[in-house]
Amino acid sequence: MHGRKREEDPNPEETAAKALELRSLQSQFMSNHHQKIYTKEAIQLSAKLLITNPEFYTAWNYPKLAFESRLDEDSDPSLVNSIIDEELGVVQNALERNVKSYGAWYHRKWVLSKKGHYYPSLENELQLLNDYQKQAHQKQDDEKQDDPSRNFHAWNYRRFVVELTKTSEEDELQYTTDMISDISFTIYSAWHYRSVLVSSLVAKKADGFMPKETIRRELDYVHSAIFTLEEKQSGWFYYLWLLDQTVKMEIPLRFSSWPSDGSIIILSGPDCFNASSSTTKLTTFCSESGSFPLILYFDQAVSGVSSSTVTIGSELKDLVWEPVSDKKNSQVDSCVWVARLKFDCREPCFSRKETKVKVSLGGIVSSMGCNLTAPYEFVFTLRIHDTVEVELSQQESIVSWTDGFDNWDDNALSNDLNSLTALNADTGFEWRKKAIKIEIELFRTLPDSKIGKLILARLLMAEETMISNGVHYKEILQLYNDLMALDSWHNQYYKDEHSVALIHKVTSRTESMSRHLFRYRNMNNIICLRLNNLTLSRIAAVEKLLFVQMLDLSHNELHSAEGLEAMQLLCCLNLSHNRIRSFSALDSLRHLKQLRVLDVSHNHICGELPVDTTRYLCSSPLSNSGETGREVPNKYQDAYLVLRDLMKLKQLDIRGNDLIFAGEEFSSFVRQVVPKLVWLDGHKLTS
């Protein structure tokens, strides 16, 4: 177990005799337990059993019952203390047998927390625990022993005792310092406990624990651990936690939107998708329902976005904001929020053909506690375009991913490319940048190592998050390339991080992004972003891509479509020639209500229904308990759960996957689920 080889018993006869004695003890104990016998002899027998086998979890219930039977409200305090001492003694002896016995630690907590009784030596309990934990490191040299100083049970019990004794957090922080500095840099629980204490003290603004000084002091402290024992992980986990606090604590709440501030949007009816090339270079939004999405994307999950916190300064009233999330309750936190704005030429606000819309945000609080203290406004312009009648044959033409693209006009770059806005000013922003820069310079001086390269890459990404000038991406990408060559065991993780950095590099500057942008003239010059053939394994930076209507991610190494749910304008998506293994990996596409064209051909999508390992933990597209009125073949179940929400889908390509997705049966299934579908696998469906 836990990678340890089972050793052969050197004294099997002695072991057999002990087992026989243990069975005899258990038999006598169970008899006493069932008959509710709580005599002195019975209690002593249970104590002997627990000391012999602390893992006999059921046996820990017996002393609790015996304890209750021996006491009442009028019990003499000296008797109470005597019984408590006896119970604590049994627990201590049991812990000497097995320091990681859940039952022993829980029983000790139960004894000390008895209501109506006060254990006068409670103050000594913390000192005893101090001595126990500090002496435990002596067993570290014995490879056959677990290291008790890293015992999670003991540290959990410590927090319980600290609460009872009202010990200060400053004293406990000093205790972790003593444990780490005097005993071992590798005590993970001490580092974890330290992070909890530091967070609390900084949040309370305790004396000497302002963010700037505290983070700098803690960074200097953890350097001793990570540079002394570089191969040990405990200190590195704490360092990464500190890095996260340096970047995120009180960071400005940033957001992007569509439409973005200052943009001009042309609204038109459904047939504009099939109109011939337009002369305009402005964003055209075509709608079959007479509405368009107003999208807010925050860099932190927020809740409570509503008509009271986001107001529309025009005749458009009573917008309903919905989180782009699988959770159905109204209190959900989400980074992406969407409202549907109705437009109708008969309405007064649209009779002018051009309407300015002002959106004001205020009173929003993120899940990290970041307050939008000052209101923020942005304004965009809507133009109503007269719908042009298009012949039926043109409406049903197939969308090609190889022809019909024009280069992006550099002179027509819209505000959409630079729409990320800081909502809050952070008074500590400069010292945070300085702290990250100091760490970068420090890690540049270290000899080459896997952990050193990984931390340097994370530090450079952290600085890019703060300054957003794109100067570090080339180095970051090279670091992850080096790591993939050095450490094949974690190749997929490095590849994912490389993909994130690459997409951020592409979207960091208008010059680099414009090289991937095109206009698709066969659909009224909608905006197409082509990120194909980049070996991407993960999607990122979608907050900068909200304006994209056509996205080509073909010939990459993607395993899922996670992240695309924020791109509410997407009407055409190409995910062909990737590594997607099931329709459940496409679950995020259910939120793309404008999607008309989907290409998932030449992946590894199979018909086997995946096992839903999250069924009892969170909502899942594989949990089908709410489905009624429709019988779906089991082999198409996960396909149904995705396709049923793509009601505007007109073109689907799923060639080159499992054979069950070919043939008349699947064609019939798709036409039932997606009634507007016209093209399947490159062939036009007959009426």
UniProtKB/Swiss-Prot annotation:
Family of this protein: Belongs to the protein prenyltransferase subunit alpha family.
Keywords annotated in UniProt: Leucine-rich repeat, Prenyltransferase, Repeat, Transferase
Q: Please provide, alphabetically and separated by semicolons, the GO molecular function terms listed in this UniProt record.
A: Rab geranylgeranyltransferase activity
Q: What does this protein do, in the record's words?
A: Catalyzes the transfer of a geranylgeranyl moiety from geranylgeranyl diphosphate to both cysteines of Rab proteins with the C-terminal sequence -CCXX, CXXX, -XCCX and -XCXC, such as RABA1A, RABA2A, RABF2A and RABG2. Does not seem to be a functional Rab-GGT alpha subunit in vitro.
Q: How does it assemble?
A: Heterotrimer composed of the alpha subunit RGTA, the beta subunit RGTB and REP; within this trimer, RGTA and RGTB form the catalytic component, while REP mediates peptide substrate binding.
UniProt EC number: 2.5.1.60
**Catalytic activity, as annotated:** geranylgeranyl diphosphate + L-cysteinyl-[protein] = S-geranylgeranyl-L-cysteinyl-[protein] + diphosphate
The scientific name of the source species is: Arabidopsis thaliana
The coding gene here is RGTA2
Q: How is its activity regulated?
A: The enzymatic reaction requires the aid of the Rab escort protein REP.
So which domain of life are we looking at? Eukaryota
Q: Which InterPro entries match?
A: Leu-rich_rpt, LRR_dom_sf, Prenyl_trans_a
Record has Transferase as a keyword: yes
Q: What is this protein called?
A: Geranylgeranyl transferase type-2 subunit alpha 2
Q: Return the LRR repeat spans.
A: 523-545, 546-567, 568-591, 592-616, 646-668
Q: Looking at the keywords, is Repeat present?
A: yes
Which residue intervals correspond to the PFTA repeats? 38-72, 83-117, 132-167, 168-203, 214-248
